[in-house]
A protein has these predicted regions:
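A short, N-terminal "cap"/entry segment at the start of jelly-roll beta-barrel domains
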Residues: 3, 7-59, 144-170
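Conserved short histidine dyad/triad with adjacent acidic residue
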Residues: 45-48, 63-79, 117
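Ligand-binding loop in jelly-roll beta-barrel domains
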Residues: 56, 114-142
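Short strand-coil-strand connectors
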Residues: 58, 96-100
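Short, conserved beta-strand element in jelly-roll/cupin
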Residues: 64-68, 79-96, 135-137
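Short, charged/polar surface micro-motifs in flexible loops or helix N-caps
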Residues: 68-72, 92, 101, 116-117, ...
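Short acidic-glycine-tyrosine-enriched beta hairpin
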Residues: 99-114
Length: 170
């Protein structure tokens, strides 16, 4: 998770302790989505705690994600290089891929190798929140593609920006 699907920017210093353990409840929640409109409002109630960052990890990200009823994890996408792994902790989510849909409950997991052109995302179609761990490596030069939406990410001297597929910025 190197930020191709950015979230709101917040400054966070990991707690200074003698041990490398972190209480997830002490890690600030990032709510909402970094997508531009009209995509942002489609995400619903999504909260993410960047546990890997809180532990000082730099080569891969680990996020504790909570999806409220009706929320989705992201727009359906695939990565050119980033491997992604998800492990469901509570509730039920529906994994939507190019091949269809599959319900995942507690203890189930899914993985997406980088470069595999199988766009995916999760939707919480249940009546209660669902939580899962999301793990992804951080590879410079990774890009994400969104087959269902007019969205791409670009990068210039000012950082990452959202654009239409024809290059016009949002």
């Amino acid at each position: 998770d190197r930020g191709i699907i950015p979230g709101p920017s917040i400054a966070f210093e990991p707690p200074m302790t003698r041990l490398p353990a972190v209480d997830p409840a002490s890690v600030p929640e990032q709510r909402g989505s970094g997508y531009p409109e009209p995509f942002r409002s489609r995400m619903g109630e999504r909260a993410k705690r960047r546990l890997g960052d809180a532990c000082g990890l730099t080569r891969f990200g680990v996020n504790l994600v909570t999806l409220g009823p009706g929320a989705q994890s992201a727009l359906r996408h695939w990565h050119t290089q980033e491997d992604e792994f998800v492990y469901v902790l509570t509730g039920e989510v529906v994994l939507v891929t190019d091949d269809g849909e599959q319900a995942l409950g507690p203890g189930m997991c899914a993985g997406y190798p980088g470069g595999r052109k199988d766009a995916h995302h999760f939707i919480n179609r249940g009546a209660t929140p669902a939580t899962y761990l999301e793990v992804g490596n951080r590879i410079e030069g990774d890009n994400a593609f969104y087959p269902d939406d007019d969205l791409m990410w670009g990068e210039d001297e000012n950082g990452v920006f959202a654009a239409h597929k024809d290059g016009r910025r949002y």
